[in-house]
A protein has these predicted regions:
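Short phosphate-engaging motifs
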Residues: 14, 48, 70
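Short, surface-exposed ligand-recognition loops at beta-strand->loop->(often short) alpha-helix junctions
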Residues: 10-18
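Glycine-rich beta-strand-turn "strand-cap" elements at beta-sheet edges
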Residues: 40-48, 76-109
Length: 109
């Protein structure tokens, strides 16, 4: 199992646009078979800092996500909204190890 944290620093005047585009991408991502979670988290002290927490079944699922049309649309749409380049960190899950505990029921499916 793979967890990816993507830190996005958004231009303050584009936060609403970024969130709209990101929520559309998150909804599509949750329909992918290898995506277990896709959380969009906004910093309470700095609304222009958004954290994406993406949980994938494995590295192949992460690679498949990056090859989807909806990801390409999101990437291109938000490119000019960034205050600085996005930074991602990949993590291995130590606990819990069961993938069933990570899957979230999608309210959008």
């Amino acid at each position: 199992m793979l967890v990816v944290h993507v830190h996005a620093r958004v231009r303050p005047e584009r936060v609403a646009d970024f969130l709209a585009a990101t929520l559309a991408n998150a909804r599509e991502s949750l329909a992918e078979p290898g995506v277990l979670r896709f959380d969009v988290i906004q910093d309470q002290a700095d609304p222009a800092h958004v954290l994406l927490t993406e949980v994938y079944r494995d590295d192949d699922a992460s690679a498949a996500h990056k090859a989807t049309p909806h990801y390409a649309v999101w990437r291109d749409t938000v490119a000019d909204m960034m205050a600085e380049p996005r930074q991602s960190v990949r993590y291995s899950v130590v606990f819990p190890v069961a993938t069933e505990g990570w899957a979230s029921e999608s309210p959008w499916s």
